[in-house]
Amino acid sequence: MNIYFLGIGGTLMGSLAQLAKAQGHIVTGSDNRLYPPMSDQLAAAEIEVFEGFDPAQLDPAPDLVVVGNAGLPRGNEAVEYVLNSGLLYTSGAEWLGRFVLPGRWVLAVAGTHGKTTTASMLTWILECAGLAPGYLIGGVPKDLSRSSRLGSDPFFVVEADEYDTSYFDRRSKFMHYRPRTLIINNLEYDHADIFPDLGAIQTQFHHLLRSVPGEGLVITPAQDDHVSEVLHQGCWTPVSRFGTGPVRKSVGADTGELWWARTTAANCAEFDVVFGHEVQGRVSWNLIGEHNVSNALAAIVAARSKGSARVPSA
C-alpha cells in the first residue's frame, strides 16, 4: 500500500510513518517544519519527505492519506485537495488502532504528566525481560534509540494522549487504542484550548475506561482524587493502585490491589517495591524524585500484569 502522511514531522505522525514502513508499505509525507529528532529518524528509515503542503505531492494519488492534527485544519490546501478529490483518508490515531494494534496486548499509558517517561520505562522493563514489545512513545528514549517499533511479541506499549484526534474526529486519541492494560498516572486540568473544564477531561477518561475489557487491568494512583472520581463513574475491570508510602486511598477508592514504594534514600535514588506487606524487589538507579518513583512503580505494576506474566519480579 502507498501511504502518505500529512504532517509527518510531528512526533505521533513521524512515529506512525516508521511503523508503516516497517510493515512494508511505501511511505511518503510532508510537513512545513521538520527538525531533529524526527527529521533524523525519518531519514534513517529512508522515508521521503516533502516541504510544505503542495497538493501536487498527492498526484498520483496514494492508496491512503493519514492526516495529522497539528496545523492541519480545514482550509489547508492539501486537506482541501484530499476532500475534493475523494481520496481515502484517516487520522493517525485511527490508523494505529486499525492497522497496528489489532491482535496485540496493548498497554496504554495515559494521564496528564509522566506519559512519555512511564511508557519508556515500561517498554524497557519488557525489553530487559527478554521480550521484544512494539511501542509508540512521544519522544526518543535514550535506551531505545527511536520513538516507535513494531516489535515481535504480542505486547505493544503506547503513549495514550487525551488531546483530540483530528479536525474531523474530536474524540481523544486514546479512544482508538482499546488497551487491555491501562495506566492512568494522574489527572489535572489541561488543554484549555479544547476542554472547558476538568469534568470534560474526566468524561474522556471514563470513555477510555469503558473500553478496557474485564480480563484486562487498570492501574491508577492511590492518592489522586481526580482519577478516583473517574473510576467512581463506573469501572468493569480489575484495578491495581500504586503510591509512595505511607499510602492513603483517595475519595471513593475501592479495595483493589495496592502496590507502594518504600524509599530507602532521601533523594529517591533507591526504593523497595512492596505489594501488600511483602517486598518484591529493590530499585537502585540514577534518577531522583518522588515523581520518577511513581512513574516507575506504575510501569512495574503494568509489566507484572496478566498480559505480561512472563516478566520476572522487580
Briefly describe each language-model feature range.
Residues 1-95, 217, 225, 256, ...:
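N-terminal leader/targeting and accessory segments in enzymes
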Residues 6, 62, 68-69, 189, ...:
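Adenine nucleotide phosphate-binding catalytic loops in nucleotide-utilizing enzymes
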Residues 10-12, 113-117, 293:
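Residue-level detector of alpha-helix initiation sites
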Residues 12, 36, 98, 142-143, ...:
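Flexible, glycine-rich phosphate/dinucleotide-binding loops
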Residues 12-14, 154, 173, 180, ...:
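Short, flexible segments with low predicted structural confidence
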Residues 19-22, 57-58, 73-222, 226-238, ...:
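Phosphate-binding loop of NTP-binding sites
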Residues 26-31, 134-136, 241:
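Short beta-strand "acidic-cap" motif of Rossmann-like dinucleotide-binding folds
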Residues 40-43, 61-64, 101-105, 146-148, ...:
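Short secondary-structure transition/capping segments
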